[in-house]
A protein has these predicted regions:
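Short connector loops at helix/strand junctions that flank enzyme active sites
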Residues: 94-96, 105-107, 121-125, 131
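Conserved short histidine dyad/triad with adjacent acidic residue
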Residues: 101-120
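A short beta-strand-loop-beta hairpin characteristic of the jelly-roll/cupin
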Residues: 111, 127-147
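A short hydrophobic beta-strand segment most commonly corresponding to one strand
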Residues: 124-129, 150-152, 166-183
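Conserved metal-binding segment of the jelly-roll/cupin
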Residues: 144-158
């Protein structure tokens, strides 16, 4: 496959999951950050079944600016609590940018979409599957993802997910600046 590249499978993610369970208050906590640099989704415009636990989120310089067109990255208070996933990241990358845990209920989908904006033009995007089984599609390629799978994908193509397991899917999605040594 050229649009999905599995880097490693069978990673022990139990300590990462344990920290997520220790801090349930972190899910959606970015909504409580009162900072004009942080763009909040308008609940009247978006229906969201995915829950988000952001560690580093995008920001804006001025009201009305699209977060996908800025390089601003802001650590959330949750960042310091999730040390196990940060340890994992340091084994592969010197620098990471925006990153978050995403949950998806059983049977739900994340519809096919492209990550748009100038921010994404210089980033590689990855998943580390933490819990649940899901079908992941990028362009015309599809794979089944099990917990402990670490992969890169081309987020400049349409991509989406479907939770085909029997528990909530949790995956860690993160960006790293393009680099020839990236996995």
């Amino acid at each position: 496959m050229k649009n999905i590249r599995v880097i490693k499978t069978g990673i022990d993610v139990s300590k990462i999951l344990e920290q997520i369970k220790e801090h349930p208050e972190d899910w959606g906590s970015q909504k409580n950050i009162k900072d004009k640099k942080i763009e909040q989704l308008d609940p009247t415009k978006y229906t969201v079944t995915v829950d988000v636990l952001q560690l580093i989120m995008g920001g804006i310089e001025k009201e009305g600016q699209y977060v996908g067109d800025t390089e601003i990255c802001i650590q959330t208070p949750a960042y310091k609590k999730h040390t196990e996933v940060l340890k994992f990241l340091k084994t592969y990358f010197k620098k990471i940018r925006r990153c978050a845990f995403l949950s998806l209920p059983v049977g739900e989908i994340v519809g096919s979409h492209i990550d748009e904006g100038t921010y994404y033009l210089t980033k590689d995007r990855y998943h580390l599957s933490i819990q649940g089984k899901y079908r992941y599609s990028v362009g015309d390629e599809t794979m089944i993802v099990e917990p402990g799978t670490f992969f890169w994908f081309n987020n400049k193509l349409p991509h989406g997910a479907e939770n085909i397991g029997d528990e909530v899917r949790i995956t860690f999605v993160f960006d790293a600046p393009h680099h020839k040594r990236n996995p």
